[in-house]
């Protein structure tokens, strides 16, 4: 479901732009600081309700302006254009419109506009803490299991309440009622995540093998507590330890995706270029799996395409993205860096000082 039109107003150094887009590849060419990454950032904000570069709304609103606006039109499965838009005020308030209807939720934006981001800081998926890999898993579960979003939100609220109760509870009995619901939610969340990884794993390992044929890739899901023990037993058994820590030590909030090559953690084996290629492979695999499961196409946002990738690796990624048939946005400093992707169906935009032509 590609974007056919994009309007950006008062976003970073982009005062106003209105561009028609290709359903295939869209290239943003310009020097550093020109605004090409800001276009990707605006699309990401349209699909996620937040920037991927800053958590502070005020930093992405243009100086001396009180608000920003990003509007898009995309073709739905019936080939009708559906308008979507997001308005953010400097005070942090947000308005979302879908199909002309105000008061929509950010989660609904994410549902209608699934996005995959590949950017220079994307190594954290493989090299940093489990929270990045949980987010990777949960992107997929969110798009394939309708009950997940509410269940995960409910679990996080209950976990926060439990952590507060741990500070005052005199016995486990004071927590047992809340723990019953927490345990039920945790088991469901874990089952959905495990099923997602099991279904997506074959696609991911195949694409990783294509990108990095010299390595054998293994993905393994860890649910956040002992696999042979029900979660309600873990909560009761670890009550005193949780009390001493001041928080619930085990649970789906500690889940992880363990990724190895030839039996060794990826961060101990792969170079930076190989790590980036694996991140690309995993993101493309998620998009392909989404299409297989739901019929939806996700949109790929690739910032600084040439970073860490030699010409051979760039060609591998370009060929794989073309095979998906998805819409792709690519930023690059020069046209020569994206030569492997250029064809008659794509669109080339030159970006300079926030102007897009």
Swiss-Prot record:
It is found in: Cytoplasm. Signal peptide: none annotated. GO terms for molecular function: ATP binding; single-stranded DNA binding. Keywords: ATP-binding, Cytoplasm, DNA damage, DNA repair, DNA replication, DNA-binding, Nucleotide-binding, SOS response. One of its GO terms (cellular component) is cytoplasm. ATP binds at residues 30-37. The keyword ATP-binding applies. InterPro entries: DNA-binding_RecF, DNA-binding_RecF_CS, P-loop_NTPase, RecF/RecN/SMC_N, RecF_2. The keyword Translocase does not apply. It comes from the Bacteria. One of its GO terms (biological process) is DNA synthesis involved in DNA repair. PANTHER family: DNA REPLICATION AND REPAIR PROTEIN RECF. Belongs to the RecF family. The RecF protein is involved in DNA metabolism; it is required for DNA replication and normal SOS inducibility. RecF binds preferentially to single-stranded, linear DNA. It also seems to bind ATP. This is DNA replication and repair protein RecF. It comes from Vibrio campbellii (strain ATCC BAA-1116). The lineage of its organism: Bacteria, Pseudomonadati, Pseudomonadota, Gammaproteobacteria, Vibrionales.
